[in-house]
A protein has these predicted regions:
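Thioredoxin-like thiol-disulfide oxidoreductase module
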Residues: 32-50
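Short alpha-helical
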Residues: 12, 37, 64
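Conserved residues at beta->alpha junctions
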Residues: 8, 33, 60
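Structural micro-motif
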Residues: 47-57, 66-67
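Local sequence-structure signature of Cys/Sec-based thiol-disulfide redox active-site neighborhoods
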Residues: 1-29
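Non-catalytic interaction surface on structured domains
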Residues: 24-29, 45-46, 58, 71-72
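Non-catalytic, surface beta->alpha helical segment in thiol-disulfide oxidoreductase systems
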Residues: 58-86
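Alpha-helical elements of the RecA-like P-loop NTPase motor core of helicases
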Residues: 15, 40, 67, 71
Length: 86
């Protein structure tokens, strides 16, 4: 399963998202905006402009930010709504 994390340096929620993915056993590719990918390429890959990072894509599905990532895994029964692994 392909997981992409679009991030920026010194982003607290980017660190949290990557930590959650690692704790759940997911491997991911990180694309740091303005280092690995331009802002224009970032918007093009997502298909729409967004204002926050991280932005996570799992198996081609745009999940969204850290909060949406926790909701995604909570809905799948992998974590509770506090972000704790079940």
């Amino acid at each position: 399963m392909t997981v992409i994390v679009y991030s920026k340096p010194a982003c607290q929620y980017c660190v949290k998202a990557k930590d959650l993915l690692e704790r759940l056993g997911y491997e991911y590719t990180e694309k740091v905006i303005t280092k690995d990918i331009s802002l224009e390429e970032f918007f093009k890959e997502l298909g729409k402009p967004v204002r926050t990072v991280p932005q996570i894509v799992i198996a081609g599905e745009h999940i969204g930010s850290y909060n949406e990532l926790t909701e995604y895994f909570a809905d799948k029964g992998k974590i509770n709504y506090k972000g704790e692994i079940i």
